[in-house]
Amino acid sequence: MTSFENSDTNIKLTDEGDLNEYLGIKMKRTTQGRELTQPALIQRILQTVGVSLDRGNRQEIKTPATTTLHQDEGGNKRQLTWDYRSVVRMLNWLARSTRPELIFAVSQVGRFMAFPKRSHEDAVMRICTYLRDTRTKGMIMKPNKNKGFEVYADADFAGGFNKHNAEDPATAKSRTCYHIMFNNCLIYSHSKLQTEIALSTTEAEYICLSQALRTVITLMRFFKELAAKIPSFKYKRPLFKCKAFEDNNGAIAIATTENLRPRTKHINIKYHHFKRYVQKGYVTIARIDTKDQLADIGTKALLPHVFVPLRKALIGW
């Protein structure tokens, strides 16, 4: 607020105090940081699909997905009557707002909104059951002004391939996931099948890294313009620099090498757009162990012992 008041821009603002709720997102200060939750939306989703809030003696569900879904053209028809599209859209808003650990599970059920089958319905119910057991949780933000932009990017190479569905081209596609952080706070998450079919793990990882940096470079430009207009909008770390974390050595080598290699010249030029930012030092590509790769949570269904630590590192619980 003070930054805008001290600027030379003609912006009229009113101070209405601390922000406690916005678009159904509740915000609360805790000893851990700023907690963002959507209890009303979660309750609405559970009521829509008919999931009881009482777990009873049933075991706690610790992950929102257990497998990769397919088209399942010959599968059984849906049994329940709730609106599949409506529920998936609510889940999508939840995942993109305060529950980014759901992003893989929600993304894959969203692929089958036109003709969902019983297997897809069961996957949605799995997400909702997981939400029942974690309905009071959200995203905890712990700002750190010493950190600028950071990107965690990961890909699952042809993770949906299945010999029973080999005729479906989508099973050969890899999945991209990336998380963009600013000041140690998650500001954007993305999980989606890649549009092209990658020919190797390295290519899938490089495409993912390129897509992630395309998004963050736009944000970097915006913050640079904002800092130029508002003198007091300054941070210890330059706003127009970014550190990207990647766990594939081949993708790192391609990203940090100035010239194209014979083995990688087939990769579309659109995926090399960020190299000049690397060469000028605006973007740094850093190696990270797979166990610490936060984006892994959005590429595939994970077992609890892998999922839970990544969730804690990503959103604080």
Protein language model annotation of sequence segments:
Residues P39-W317:
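Divalent metal-binding acidic/histidine catalytic loops
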Residues M1-I42, Q47-V49, R132-T134, K142, ...:
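Polymerase palm active-site segment centered on the conserved acidic dipeptide of motif C
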